[in-house]
Amino acid sequence: MSSSDIFDVLNIKQKSRSPTNGQVSVPSSSAANRPKPQVTGMQRELFNLLGENQPPVVIKSGNNFKEKMLSTSKPSPWSFVEFKANNSVTLRHWVKGSKELIGDTPKESPYSKFNQHLSIPSFTKEEYEAFMNENEGTQKSVESEKNHNENFTNEKKDESKNSWSFEEIEYLFNLCKKYDLRWFLIFDRYSYNNSRTLEDLKEKFYYTCRNYFKASDPSNPLLSSLNFSAEKEIERKKYLQRLLSRSAAEIAEEEALVVESKKFEMAAKRTLAERESLLRLLDSPHSDQTITQYLTSQGMSQLYNALLADKTRKRKHDLNIPENPWMKQQQQFAQHRQLQQLNVKKSEVKENLSPKKTKRQRQEMQTALKRKSESAYAEQLLKDFNSDERKALGVITHGEKLSPGVYLRSTKLSTFKPALQNKILAILQELSLPSRPVMPSFDVMERQEELLKKINTLIDLKKHVDKYEAGMSITK
């Protein structure tokens, strides 16, 4: 496939090489003599496909090496000179500049300002004996006031402290200066007395420093930071060793205990919050006045409005506003009076309109009057019988309204909520009693009802006692 075929496929018009309209294109001499540029990085056949179109990117052939840096400035000289790393060591390094400008004398290192050391106290043998004897005298006066056992242990400690010589203490302080209180290095390099432990070295160093500063200035604030106890340090290391030598099961058990403790803390906080809310609700309004002002209806209304308007207490405001009990009682009294007045009016109207009643209404009224008279007659008859005679005759007066039809007495037992009902049934099983009596007579049902009420009361009391004991254990 040639380039002309590809141009035809792509619908590109190729310039005709034959003359058109009698015009002949005469190539110039410069164009003819111009050499064609050699294309690199592209195949010749692919480049021929471009035809007379210019390529989108100028392709230039050139080397990929960096050009030589051309600089007219003279290079600055560098000198290999000496410098003092410290007072005993002299090293050499390269410095920009000639030797004439720098000089022959070695200069200090610019990093010497960062080479800081701790200020360890130094003293002579006379000074050491002076402040140590002074401190031991004050310590003996304090120890005389303590018990015999404490004195015995302190004497042992003093003997161990007095076994240190001045030369050994001086050797210890020199090591502390040399290694800047890096105690593991000090303990590793310590060769004066191999029986000393790391805690002994620390304790003796801080004990001597505390006596030194105390003799010069008793009110020095550094004295409180120089207290070191070797026994506590040993206990701390033992505890850390036990902590790091735990097994995976022990770690999991401790994590479970931590989770349980957090649960107990949350429950304790919740219980305290509930107790605070209850105490806040039971808290009466603070007033210097007597209670007699709240005995009237006007005083009760004022108290009710004051409690509603009290927004300073941190309590949850319910959307349902509580009813005023005094107003509710007044409404009940008013309704009762209205009903009485209506009944009186109805009786008067009935008496006046009695001839206008229908036959059915008259019969219903007669049956009602008959029942009323029968119940009154029955009560009058039962007045002459005592409780034993009533029980023998089986006569019972029902105060509540009985449901029509036949029913079982066991179905009239009072029921409770499911959770409370399960607790009551569990207690009845512990007492070896059935949930329903086998012989549900009237007396048995009464006793069963009383038993259920007492069990309910005991469960409620146990709940309050457990809550109170939990609160007491939390407050302790």
UniProtKB/Swiss-Prot annotation:
User: What's the encoding gene here?
Assistant: SWC4
More info: Present with 2230 molecules/cell in log phase SD medium.
Q: Which GO terms describe its cellular component?
A: chromatin; NuA4 histone acetyltransferase complex; nucleus; Swr1 complex
Protein name as annotated: SWR1-complex protein 4
Q: MF terms per GO, please?
A: transcription corepressor activity
Per UniProt, the ranges with Basic and acidic residues bias are 142-157
Q: N-acetylserine modification sites? A: 2
Functionally, this protein is described as follows: Component of the SWR1 complex which mediates the ATP-dependent exchange of histone H2A for the H2A variant HZT1 leading to transcriptional regulation of selected genes by chromatin remodeling. Component of the NuA4 histone acetyltransferase complex which is involved in transcriptional activation of selected genes principally by acetylation of nucleosomal histone H4 and H2A. The NuA4 complex is also involved in DNA repair.
- Organism the protein comes from: Saccharomyces cerevisiae (strain ATCC 204508 / S288c) (Baker's yeast)
On assembly, the entry states: Component of the SWR1 chromatin-remodeling complex composed of at least ACT1, ARP4, RVB1, RVB2, ARP6, YAF9, VPS71, VPS72, SWC3, SWC4, SWC5, SWC7 and SWR1, and perhaps BDF1. Component of the NuA4 histone acetyltransferase complex composed of at least ACT1, ARP4, YAF9, VID21, SWC4, EAF3, EAF5, EAF6, EAF7, EPL1, ESA1, TRA1 and YNG2. Interacts with YAF9. Interacts with EAF1.
Note the Gene3D superfamilies from the entry.
Answer: Homeodomain-like
What compartments host this protein?
Nucleus
Instruction: Give any Pfam family that matches.
Output: SANT_DAMP1_like
Which GO biological process annotations does it have?
chromatin remodeling; chromosome organization; DNA repair; DNA-templated transcription; negative regulation of transcription by RNA polymerase II; regulation of DNA-templated transcription
- UniProt record similarity statement: Belongs to the SWC4 family.
Q: Where is the SANT domain?
A: 156-209
